[in-house]
C-alpha cells in the first residue's frame, strides 16, 4: 500500500528548541513559502495548516501558497460554530477551484473553553459535536450541488446553495480527528478520513477498530491517518540526541504551565496525550521509538518517532499494517526537517508521489443574474 505523506506549516512559530526563544526564527510568508516549496519538490502529498488563536489564519495562508506550488495539497481547518456551513462551503469550493483541485479540509470542533469563548462559542463538549454534525451535513450537501433547507438544533438555513461547484467531485475530502464517543460517531457517519494522534500502536488499533465498526453500522467505509512528529537521523544515537536537544531548554515551570493549560480543555484526545507522560521528563519513550517529549509543552500531537531511516520506516509500516494510509508529519525546525525526512525516511517507504494536476476546464459563464443564478445558453428551436 502506497502511503500519503503530509508535512506541516508552522504558522504558530518554529525553531530548534521547544518552550524558549533560543534558536527560534521569524515565521513570515517567505519562510512558509520555503517550507511549502520544499514539501512540493520532495514529494509530500500535502501540508496540514493548523488553526486557533495561536496561529495565522489557515485559509489565507493556504490561498497564498497556491501560486508558488504545483502539486502540493492544503489541509485546511473547517471551524463549526465559528463559521456558517454555507459560508464555509463557498470558501471551500473557491479554494478548490483556485488551487485546481488541491484543497482538503479538516473538521476542527475546538476544545479550549477559554479560546472558544473568545470566539463567541459557549457550547459544551456534546453540544459542539451536535453542532459539528449538523454543520457537516449542510456543508457536504451544498458541495454536492443541493439547495439546502435545514432546521436543526444548532444550524438553520433556508434555500442555501452554491453557484460555483468545487473541482473535486463529489467534494474535496474531509478529515477529522476526535477520541470521544460522540467524535467517533461523527467521523463514522460523515467524514472521509479519521485522524488520530500518535499513540502507541495497540491504542491506535483499538481506535481504528471502534471507528471502522461504527462506520460499518452506517453502511460506510472510512480511511485512516495519523499525526506524528519525526526525528530521523543517519544513526539512532544521533536521533535520540536530537530529541534530547529539542527539550534541553525546557524548565519545570514552563512544563507545569503548559500542562495546566491542557488540563482545562475538554478534549479526550488531549487527555490521552497528557497521560502518556504525565508531565514528567523521565520514561518519555512510551513505545519502541515513540517519544512523548514534544507533548510536555505542545498541545495536540505530542509524540515523535525517533531513530534512523530504516527504524522509523519500520514503525510507520506497523501503523500502516493497522490500516493507516496517510501520515501527517512534522519536525523542528520544519524547513530542515522536511528535507531530512524526505532524504532519510522516504527511500525506505512506499511513498505515493502526487502528480502535477492538469488544468481543469471550467464552463464558460456570464455574470450571475440578480445574484441568483448563472445564465446558460438556451437551445434555439
From Swiss-Prot:
UniProt xrefs under CDD domains: Alkanesulfonate_monoxygenase
Biological-process GO terms, alphabetical: alkanesulfonate catabolic process
Annotated EC: 1.14.14.5
Transmembrane regions: none
UniProt superkingdom: Bacteria
Catalytic reaction list: an alkanesulfonate + FMNH2 + O2 = an aldehyde + FMN + sulfite + H2O + 2 H(+)
Family named by the database record: Belongs to the SsuD family.
PANTHER family assigned to the protein according to its UniProt record, in alphabetical order: ALKANESULFONATE MONOOXYGENASE, ALKANESULFONATE MONOOXYGENASE-RELATED
HAMAP family per record: Alkanesulf_monooxygen
Protein name (database record): Alkanesulfonate monooxygenase
Gene that specifies this protein: ssuD
Amino acid at each position: 500500500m502506497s502511503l500519503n505523506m503530509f508535512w506541516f506549516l508552522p504558522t504558530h512559530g518554529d525553531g530548534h528548541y521547544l518552550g524558549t526563544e533560543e534558536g527560534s526564527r521569524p515565521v513570515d510568508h517567505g519562510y512558509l513559502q520555503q517550507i511549502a516549496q520544499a514539501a512540493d519538490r520532495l514529494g509530500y502529498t500535502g501540508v496540514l495548516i493548523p488553526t486557533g488563536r495561536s496561529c495565522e489564519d489557515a485559509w489565507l495562508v493556504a490561498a497564498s501558497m497556491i501560486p508558488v506550488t504545483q502539486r502540493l495539497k492544503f489541509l485546511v481547518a473547517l471551524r463549526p460554530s465559528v463559521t456558517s456551513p454555507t459560508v464555509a462551503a463557498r470558501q471551500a469550493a473557491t479554494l478548490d477551484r483556485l488551487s485546481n483541485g488541491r484543497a482538503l479540509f479538516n473538521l476542527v470542533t475546538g476544545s479550549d473553553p477559554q479560546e472558544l469563548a473568545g470566539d463567541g462559542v459557549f457550547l459544551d463538549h456534546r453540544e459542539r459535536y451536535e453542532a459539528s454534525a449538523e454543520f457537516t451535513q449542510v456543508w457536504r450537501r451544498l458541495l454536492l450541488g443541493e439547495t439546502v433547507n435545514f432546521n436543526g438544533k444548532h444550524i438553520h438555513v433556508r434555500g442555501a446553495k452554491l453557484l460555483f461547484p468545487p473541482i473535486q467531485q463529489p467534494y474535496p475530502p474531509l478529515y477529522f480527528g476526535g477520541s470521544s464517543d460522540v467524535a467517533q460517531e461523527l467521523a463514522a457517519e460523515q467524514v472521509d478520513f479519521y485522524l488520530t494522534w500518535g499513540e502507541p500502536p495497540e491504542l491506535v488499533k483499538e481506535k481504528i477498530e471502534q471507528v471502522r465498526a461504527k462506520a460499518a453500522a452506517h453502511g460506510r467505509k472510512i480511511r485512516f491517518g495519523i499525526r506524528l512528529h519525526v526525528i530521523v537521523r543517519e544513526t539512532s544515537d544521533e536521533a535520540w540526541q536530537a530529541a534530547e536537544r529539542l527539550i534541553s531548554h525546557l524548565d519545570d515551570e514552563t512544563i507545569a504551565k503548559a500542562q495546566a493549560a491542557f488540563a482545562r480543555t475538554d478534549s479526550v484526545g488531549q487527555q490521552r496525550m497528557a497521560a502518556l507522560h504525565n508531565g514528567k521528563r523521565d520514561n518519555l519513550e512510551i513505545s519502541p521509538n515513540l517519544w512523548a517529549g514534544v507533548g510536555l509543552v505542545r498541545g495536540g500531537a505530542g509524540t515523535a518517532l525517533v531513530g534512523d531511516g530504516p527504524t522509523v520506516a519500520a514503525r510507520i509500516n506497523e501503523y500502516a499494517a493497522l490500516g493507516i494510509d496517510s501520515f501527517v508529519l512534522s519536525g523542528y525546525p520544519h524547513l530542515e526537517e522536511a528535507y531530512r525526512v524526505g532524504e532519510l525516511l522516504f527511500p525506505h517507504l512506499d511513498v505515493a508521489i502526487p502528480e502535477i494536476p492538469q488544468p481543469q476546464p471550467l464552463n464558460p459563464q456570464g455574470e450571475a443574474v440578480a445574484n441568483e443564478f448563472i445564465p446558460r445558453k438556451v437551445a434555439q428551436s
